[in-house]
Amino acid sequence: MLECFESSPVAVAVGVSLLVLLLLCGIGCAWHWNRRESTPFTLPKFMQRRSSRQKDVTKTVSSSAYVISPSMKASVESKGHKSTAKRNKMHGNYENVEVCPPCTEGTTEKALYENTQPSNLEEHVYGNQTDPLYYNFQKPSPPPPQDDDIYILPDCD
């Protein structure tokens, strides 16, 4: 395939243009890496992590001469942002959670976690035995034997 382009001017032009393109790409990459070391690359705010955004905010606040007083801070919070204390109160109130002081008696916890009943060695631990305390189930028994043999005769017309 390349034999037809060996001595033609088209092959020389294509080769030179590819070399120039490769040279431009190399210069662009070198410029990008040198520039990247001097100034850090910053992502847009929606792509940054929250922790890095907070670090950026603290850097900008400390470098600026503008100081926020506590009264101004309260007005900023009331504009549209909820404070963390309010958020924690909201998440702490669940409907189905019983709130009471912790139990000091160790006997109730012991009864919950320890099996104090003596073990029955004849009990089948891994078998398919049903316990009558939990199930109202009767094991199927074979049907009673029939005394008479029943024969079904076809109809004769």
Swiss-Prot record:
Segments carrying the region annotation (Disordered) are: 117-157
Coarse class of the protein's main subcellular location: membrane
Compartments, record wording = Cell membrane
Which Pfam families does this entry report, sorted A to Z? GAPT (PF11770)
Entry membrane topology? Single-pass membrane protein
Q: Which family does it belong to?
A: Belongs to the GAPT family.
- What protein name applies here? Protein GAPT
